[in-house]
């Protein structure tokens, strides 16, 4: 019952965020707002497919490629959004860059015990790119961490991605009650992150954004 309510809450929040970002994109005609809309829309489509399968078949989708493709696209749009806001101007040091890219790879190897190999490889590649840009902005070796809007955007993206990883990890141990509740908490944290992407784009630009 709790899972159903949490999933419904995520669908509602995603729908509202998609509508708000679309209106902002049409009003401002700026690329960041359009990319944010596509991020929401892609994630929403993946969620809808997943929930339809749960509702009609009372089990997770046997053909998960449909939802996976939607979520791949969502993370790529988030990556493009960060790049558009200036994330390509910030880089990690060599050691930090290796550590950031190693994390998604190690997690993918861990998840392969339960999930599809190809899907985990794709997620590792996408998350490696995304984490590189996020940490490059938040922990830039040059000391220039970007403008206020970019920092808030990357901070929200970091929390969102880490919550996603936490929920994936918890789902691997679904039979353990304590970790199952952790999964719900992680998924709820992800849901609550969605509106903050809109708030981040509405933040006044700092010096590095100008």
Task: Please report, for each region that a protein language model flagged, where it lies by residue.
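Short aromatic-rich membrane-water interface segments that cap or initiate transmembrane helices
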Residues: 1-5, 61-70, 180-185
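C-terminal transmembrane-bundle signature of multipass membrane proteins
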Residues: 79, 131-210
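Hydrophobic alpha-helical transmembrane segments of multi-pass membrane proteins
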Residues: 9-21, 32-56, 67-75, 104-107, ...
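Internal transmembrane alpha-helix with an interfacial aromatic "cap," most often the third helix
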Residues: 17-28, 54-62, 66-100, 108, ...
């Amino acid at each position: 019952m709790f899972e159903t309510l949490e999933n419904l809450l995520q669908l509602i929040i995603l729908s509202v965020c998609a509508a708000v970002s679309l209106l902002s994109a049409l009003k401002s005609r700026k690329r960041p707002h359009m990319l944010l809309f596509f991020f929401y829309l892609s994630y929403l489509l993946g969620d809808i497919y997943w929930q339809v399968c749960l509702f009609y078949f009372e089990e997770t989708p046997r053909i998960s490629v449909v939802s996976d493709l939607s979520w791949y696209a969502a993370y790529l749009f988030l990556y493009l959004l960060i790049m558009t806001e200036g994330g390509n101007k910030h880089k990690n040091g060599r050691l930090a860059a290796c550590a950031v890219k190693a994390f998604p790879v190690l997690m993918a190897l861990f998840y392969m015990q339960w999930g599809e190999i190809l899907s985990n490889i794709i997620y590792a590649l996408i998350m490696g790119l995304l984490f590189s840009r996020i940490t490059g902005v938040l922990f830039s070796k040059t000391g220039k961490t970007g403008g206020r809007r970019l920092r808030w955007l990357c901070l929200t993206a970091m929390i969102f991605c880490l919550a996603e990883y936490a929920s994936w990890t918890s789902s691997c141990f679904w039979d353990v009650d304590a970790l199952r509740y952790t999964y719900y908490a992680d998924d709820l944290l992800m849901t609550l992150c969605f509106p903050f992407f809109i708030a981040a784009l509405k933040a006044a630009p700092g010096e590095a954004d100008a």
